[in-house]
């Protein structure tokens, strides 16, 4: 971001962006040019935050959304389809549990809830259709801890990625990617925001997957775009 030496970065209050010419516009819509198109899928102010969160978590890329649930749904809807399965911990934030129980079931995705403090229970729940392992650690609301390395290694042995909700700890106290997780999600409304004055979410992970979450998960499924004000 070019800030002209400003100590505080500018807030880009634009819905759309101009192209130098038609050819550049075509390249951007085709994903061949990294410039901006529409603030619903990318904004310079939001991109600055995304870069910093990716750096803090030690990930390749990040996607910021309008809320934590926006991050979770945009990410998961990009990773599974009808007939797939998810193995999730039995202790989850209530709204996340609601998405798993109602939203995903309506799309033909099966979610198996197990005690993830017991790796054997996770192993028993994994099938050839399992596409994702999901947990919170510490979990909401009972603060239960999960051995992330053990679960991540178990998933890796079956070719299944682990997604961890790191809302409670933030990267200041815990970096799940360093323990083998593939994805990290946050409700940035809480400890990352810190002051109770914003709503935001984030997902961090491999650049290719984050791009799909941006252009499919947010752009086509949830519309959970983050405001540049937040």
Regions found by a protein language model. Give the residues of each.
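N-terminal glycine-rich, Lys/His-bearing helix-loop that initiates the first secondary-structure elements
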Residues: 1-33
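Alpha-helix initiation/capping motif
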Residues: 2, 38-42, 115, 202
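Residue-level marker of positions within ordered structural domains that often coincide
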Residues: 18, 58, 206
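Conserved N-terminal alpha-helix of the aminotransferase class I/II PLP-enzyme fold
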Residues: 21-70, 97-103
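Conserved PLP-enzyme active-site core in the AAT-like
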Residues: 62-230
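Selective for proline/serine-rich intrinsically disordered segments
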Residues: 7-8, 42, 79, 136
